[in-house]
């Protein structure tokens, strides 16, 4: 029988009853409350990407534990390599709990989830992961039993099955992300701009839509690499609008940019130390000096803005010099209410952008 709004506390206790833990992963909105519950218990290890999460889990298995990896199905691609060349090869066991975005039975989901949602079951089977849809706490026993004979098994979680668990947030930073984007949009108006997935793209679209804006709604962590590819083919200034969670997911892109040194690239990271679109779960940016990372990766200059006045001045300084340059903008966690969705299809975004660059 399908359980609706399963309590995070009961789910956690059932997992612990069978000896599961530790818990690691990448935040997901489908069961975002469970991540927050684990954070409050200090039982969650945030990973920058899903492959890293599975590797952490594998290491804990080698130390005698029964690890759990939490993720969204969009991140399955990131863990295919450690699943096929580590877990399967070395007979290392892990339980995956996967938020199922784009389930064909949920046709109203966002377009970036449609293909992966349709192929999730087939993809798991293809890489030898037996799966089951989580419908009740009894399915934890199923997972435990199946792990006796399998290296990795997965429980798929549909929206609404696990209850929402709200997080209390506080911040000492002055700006909201929306306020920072208003300043950035004004100073970079008419320039080529690449904006990262989720709320950064939606807010930029609302503040200053432009035919030279390229909004991505998926491909988390790849925006700076996409921008690099364009910057190397154009002479005009290219602006990257990134987020801390996305930047951390594929941090190696900074080293590539620093090595290639495109003079026309300015990389801006709007850092709220959380995953805004999935429930404000913590990233690891609070203990990572991203501005220094960029500088040590070979960026020409790197600055940090904590206030509106600093953002105005430091952004202008970096716009006036050759790059690649990096600007870290610390902002409050949270989202502006009722920000509209991008009304262009992904294909329309591509065609409009390419025509603008001709």
Predicted feature locations:
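A short, acidic, amphipathic alpha-helical segment used as a generic capping/interface helix at domain edges
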Residues: 8, 144-145, 308-320
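DG-centered beta-turn motif at the end of beta-strands
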Residues: 74, 237-247, 252-254
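Active-site regions of oxyanion-processing enzymes, predominantly non-cytosolic
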Residues: 151-156, 323-329
